[in-house]
Amino acid sequence: MNKFPWLTIIVVLPIFAGSFILFLPHKGNRVIRWYTICICMLELLLTTYAFCYHFQLDDPLIQLVEDYKWINFFDFRWKLGIDGLSIGPVLLTGFITTLATLAAWPVTRDSRLFHFLMLAMYSGQIGSFSSRDLLLFFIMWELELIPVYLLLSMWGGKKRLYSATKFILYTAGGSIFLLMGVLGVGLSGSNEPTLNFETSVNQSYPVALEIIFYIGFFIAFAVKLPILPLHTWLPDTHGEAHYSTCMLLAGILLKMGAYGLIRINMELLPHAHSIFSPWLMIVGTIQIIYAASTSPGQRNLKKRIAYSSVSHMGFILIGIASITDTGLNGAILQIISHGFIGAALFFLAGTSYDRIRLVYLDQMGGVAIPMPKIFTMFSSFSMASLALPGMSGFVAEVIVFLGIITSQKYLLMPKIAITFVMAIGMILTPIYSLSMLRQMFYGYKLFNTPNAYVFDSGPRELFVSISIFLPVIGIGMYPDFVLSLSVDKVEGILSNYFYR
């Protein structure tokens, strides 16, 4: 047990401090913005301090553990802890949420509620990544859905209510399977119902039962990741949501699905995972090709970026299915890498929309001349998205490739076939990325003539873009920033598998 409750403070602070926003004066937008940003900064500094001074990198076990009795009736505990798998997503959450609150500066309608919902979402996400009790994980998973639904339905495009309803139907449907899986695992292990992660990891289940649990958890995480064919909420949601909400969705929300797959499906249910992993591999390769070939057909800029997210999630799925140290490390690196790149692309798409008020790519063109800074940043992040060497996306995809090639589970021919199909997907990625840049920034359209209302990015937007760009370059140059966090934990997870 940790003496000082670092994690409880980190989880509770945003929603607790955020509740005071509702008492701030109604007209004081500036006060509300600064208050929210200060809370996010304080939270990020607290998290960084706790991890720098109280987290040992070479220890693969759970650290900063807090374990309090909550409900005696069925041994439900408030149990939090951090290990090498969850430290990356927690820091990513803090970083992206702080920048998303800065990106939400222009929001003036109901800004008190908007900023409170962002902070409530922050608490739910950090709680999901750090909970060590299955029911607590489920509660945090659900807590984070309510703010997202309200953010989607109240701020965004004309069809925002439709996309918010679609989002909540998909995710609530997935959550039913998650709850069934959590209760099944908790009740079937022994005479005493136990929802503790540590005891569940050491349980052995009959194979048929483990497969049923695996499918239940998989459906819940497949909606969130998203995995084909449960991905259709994503383009609609991203197409309509406000861009600061999009940053949180692309940067953190999707990563919760990948985190759940590794944390529960791989760690708790290793036998079922080794049975299903070839199918995951096939679905992952289909997803890369499908999304990369669907993306060029999208007229809406944000929908095109959303399909690129679906394509990148295929790499995470393949890394998880490879059951190798290298592949799983590559998947974790891709989780962090895409968190930065996806958030930045949606932010830049949103700031461009604020200026030119156009959504469809075929109506744009020639925007590079009046907005050179936005053009430069957009081009840079598009290159990062198509895995240009020297950027984080390239390292992550190469490590996933190596993970498949070195996997002991698959025969040579299937490995060659999967690698070949993935390579085709990597060729399709530049096609939609570069055509998006060409349609938006080049050519001759209305924006070649000087306009009073089309102006370049200001210091706030430039600060957000550069803040995200630095870690993308940093991880691309020196991936051990992220890999050193997870490498021991990955070895621990894979020690449960037979062939190594």
From Swiss-Prot:
Gene Ontology CC terms: chloroplast thylakoid membrane
Alphabetically, the GO molecular function entries are:
NADH dehydrogenase (ubiquinone) activity; quinone binding
- Reaction catalysed? a plastoquinone + NADH + (n+1) H(+)(in) = a plastoquinol + NAD(+) + n H(+)(out); a plastoquinone + NADPH + (n+1) H(+)(in) = a plastoquinol + NADP(+) + n H(+)(out)
Which UniProt key words apply to this protein?
Chloroplast, Membrane, NAD, NADP, Plastid, Plastoquinone, Quinone, Thylakoid, Translocase, Transmembrane, Transmembrane helix
Disulfide partners: none
EC number, UniProt record: 7.1.1.-
Quick one: a GO biological-process term for this protein? ATP synthesis coupled electron transport
The portions of this protein that span the membrane are 4-24, 37-57, 87-107, 113-130, 134-154, 167-187, 207-227, 242-262, 272-292, 305-325, 330-350, 386-406, 416-436, 462-482
The reply on keyword Oxidoreductase is no
Protein family membership: Belongs to the complex I subunit 4 family.
Would you tell me the protein name for this molecule? NAD(P)H-quinone oxidoreductase chain 4, chloroplastic
**Organism this protein belongs to:** Lactuca sativa (Garden lettuce)
